[in-house]
């Protein structure tokens, strides 16, 4: 039975884990790290880089290096948050053909699902290299406050990456699962999850293997990226005051600022002051300019105070929905890299009135929980029941543009709910069902998930036809909606896609593209390996020629030199087969050199040759072996 992997597809970093027996294990990637930067880059030569290699070249290739792509997944291009993001990143965000936010590199457009799929492929390969077998199934985590469009887009990313996504699981729920499996206790816990791009708060009851989510809340555009942006603005403004140059207008400088801001933020979790030092950050007519600014922890805390306070309102809402007071929470679990910040820890402590639990690794606990859920689905982990909730209310638009809820937020999923509606006009033969998700009273103020038409309704006065609308939310939190005319039995069903999201044809094309990229990556690896092998053979052959040139016949020597020249020419091109053929030819020429040397050794009776001296010599009764020591016979000892 093949393994199910658990993947935490994070905004900043991603992580993969598997179940080994009763324990979850986080797998190290090819670079030896337990987390992988959620970054994808395309080089000038068309090569695709994922993870650490992409991060390493970001400063010199900012326009084609994609990070924090999770913040765009399932979002419309005209969404105000998308427009805000455009000013924060050095890469191009464009409107896709379906109206969603896409990104562009070297003239080619990619959906956020496709970029995410490249990261998922990297996690899949990491697991396959460790297990030594193919992996086809996964549990992938998403922020609890992700809407249906974002969940569907994440599931699409899994499909593009060649994975069957068995379950989409909420990140705080996964963290609670990992915590609960270790603690084996009972009680009410709150999971405060502040990551690179999103914030979630979930309240759960744990007991006897049952993990029941009571409520969840959050902000899908609040995380470490926003904290970094505050530092970037501060550094840029200080530099502008001093030098009169706005670094944010220079994409290369902006990328260097971003890396420096992230580093400073991390350092200030452990120390009270740090220095941001960026030599040659820009230049003007007077020459190069250097940035050197001291940043204290207190200054950082002042800069991000509004962001920290923004996490409190969702906490209040989650407690209210769960019908609990802060004092009734038994344990607060901190998840996400941002929770290492002392200001966050202090804020959580003040709000909940207790010291938060910091015994879990905030970067890995979500992937561990996903692996455990994979074990539950495969039957490897027994006596665990996970009851999650839908984060946002679902409903349809009714007369006057009112949002009529069919399923309230924090309803346990999977769930199904039906309600009967009627026509608004006399002799109306068709109705358009518009599906929305959100908490506002008017439909237009909420997120539209999609729409469909129910046709062929018999003519009748308004209010007479009976149209039954059914909402069905599966365990992944993904919505299916159907509408049925009770008189005729006619039914129309849709699986809600990200409004204008990826069609099946889009996904199939992207799957093929991803497979092609994987094939290209394999070819590139083969090319590098072939060049390395050729380079090694050239080196050893040239050494043989330089050390033994005087002992080699001219013909063999010339043949080897010609083979080296031909191989060097082949190495300059990208034809793997040609490089291998020329490498084989040089190997043959090199073998002939070896034979010629062996023959020359025989003819001269050289050391080690049959019939030649083995390296020992006798002279004057004195026997010397390999010049290491001397044996003197007894007669000579006496005469001495």
Curated annotation (Swiss-Prot):
Among its keywords, does the record have tRNA processing? Answer: no
- Sequence segments annotated as region (Disordered): 600-640
Q: Which domain of life is it from?
A: Bacteria
InterPro entries per the UniProt record, alphabetical: ATPase_NBD (IPR043129), Chaperone_DnaK (IPR012725), Heat_shock_70_CS (IPR018181), HSP70_C_sf (IPR029048), HSP70_peptide-bd_sf (IPR029047), Hsp_70_fam (IPR013126)
Q: What induces it?
A: By stress conditions e.g. heat shock.
Keywords (A to Z) from UniProt: ATP-binding, Chaperone, Nucleotide-binding, Phosphoprotein, Stress response
GO MF assignments: ATP binding; ATP-dependent protein folding chaperone; unfolded protein binding
Compositional bias (Gly residues) = 603-614
Query: CDD domains given for it?
Result: ASKHA_NBD_HSP70_HSPA9
Please list the residues that carry the modification Phosphothreonine: 198
Q: Which residues form a coiled coil?
A: none
Family statement: Belongs to the heat shock protein 70 family.
- Record PANTHER family: HEAT SHOCK PROTEIN 70KDA
What's its job? Answer: Acts as a chaperone.
Name-wise, this protein is: Chaperone protein DnaK
Q: Which organism is it from?
A: Rhodospirillum centenum (strain ATCC 51521 / SW)
């Amino acid at each position: 039975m093949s393994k199910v992997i658990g993947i935490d597809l994070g905004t900043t970093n991603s992580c993969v884990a598997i179940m080994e027996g009763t324990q979850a294990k986080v797998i190290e990637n090819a670079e030896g790290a337990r987390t992988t930067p959620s970054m994808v880059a395309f080089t000038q030569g068309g090569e695709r880089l994922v993870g650490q290699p992409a991060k390493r070249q970001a400063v010199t290739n900012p326009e084609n290096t994609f990070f924090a792509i999770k913040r765009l997944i399932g979002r419309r291009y005209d969404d105000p948050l998308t427009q805000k993001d455009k000013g924060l990143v050095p890469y191009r965000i464009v409107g896709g053909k379906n109206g969603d936010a896409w990104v562009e590199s070297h003239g080619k457009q990619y959906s956020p699902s496709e970029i995410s799929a490249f990261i998922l492929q990297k996690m899949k390969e990491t697991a396959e290299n460790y297990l030594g077998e193919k992996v086809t199934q996964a549990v992938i985590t998403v922020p609890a406050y992700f809407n249906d469009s974002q969940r569907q887009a994440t599931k699409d990313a899994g499909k593009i990456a060649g994975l069957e996504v068995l379950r989409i699981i909420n990140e705080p729920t996964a963290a609670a699962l990992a915590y609960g499996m270790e603690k084996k206790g009972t009680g009410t816990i709150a999971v405060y999850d502040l990551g690179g791009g999103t914030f979630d708060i979930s309240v759960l009851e744990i007991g006897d293997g049952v993990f029941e989510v009571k409520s969840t809340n959050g902000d899908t555009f609040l995380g470490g990226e926003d904290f970094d942006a505050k530092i970037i603005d501060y550094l840029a403004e200080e530099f502008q005051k001093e030098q009169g140059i706005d670094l944010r207008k220079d994409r290369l400088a902006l990328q260097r600022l971003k890396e420096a801001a992230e580093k400073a933020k991390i350092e200030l979790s452990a120390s009270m002051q740090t220095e941001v030092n960026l030599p040659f950050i820009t230049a003007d007519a007077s020459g190069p300019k250097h940035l050197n600014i001291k940043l204290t922890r207190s200054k950082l805390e002042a800069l991000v105070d509004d962001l920290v306070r923004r996490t409190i309102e969702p906490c209040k809402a989650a407690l209210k929905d769960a019908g609990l007071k802060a004092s009734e929470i038994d344990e607060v679990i901190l998840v996400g890299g941002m929770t290492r910040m002392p200001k966050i820890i202090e804020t959580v402590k003040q709000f909940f009135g207790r010291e938060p639990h910091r015994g879990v690794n905030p970067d890995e606990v979500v992937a561990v929980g996903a692996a455990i859920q994979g074990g539950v689905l495969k039957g490897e982990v027994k006596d665990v029941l996970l009851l999650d909730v839908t984060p946002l209310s679902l409903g349809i638009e009714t007369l006057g543009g009112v949002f009529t809820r069919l399923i309230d937020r924090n309803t346990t999923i999977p769930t199904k709910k039906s309600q009967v509606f009627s026509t608004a006009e006399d002799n109306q033969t068709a109705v358009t069902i518009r599906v929305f998700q959100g908490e506002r009273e008017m439909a237009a103020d909420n997120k539209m998930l999609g729409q469909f038409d129910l046709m062929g309704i018999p003519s009748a006065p308004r209010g007479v036809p009976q149209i039954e609308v059914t909402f069905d939310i599966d365990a992944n939190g993904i919505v299916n909606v159907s509408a049925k005319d009770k008189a005729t039995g006619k039914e129309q069903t849709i699986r809600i896609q990200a409004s204008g999201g990826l069609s099946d044809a889009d996904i199939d094309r992207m799957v093929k593209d991803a497979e092609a990229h994987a094939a290209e990556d394999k070819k590139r690896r083969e090319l590098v390996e072939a060049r390395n092998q050729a380079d090694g053979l050239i080196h050893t052959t040239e050494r043989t020629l330089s050390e033994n040139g005087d002992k080699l016949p001219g013909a063999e020597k010339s043949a080897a030199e010609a083979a080296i020249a031909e191989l060097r020419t082949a190495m300059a091109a990208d034809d793997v087969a040609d490089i291998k053929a020329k490498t084989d030819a040089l190997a043959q020429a090199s073998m002939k050199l070896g034979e010629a040397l062996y023959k020359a050794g025989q003819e001269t009776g050289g050391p080690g040759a049959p019939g030649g001296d083995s390296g020992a010599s006798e002279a004057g009764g004195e026997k010397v072996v390999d010049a290491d020591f001397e044996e003197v016979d007894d007669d000579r000892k006496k005469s001495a």
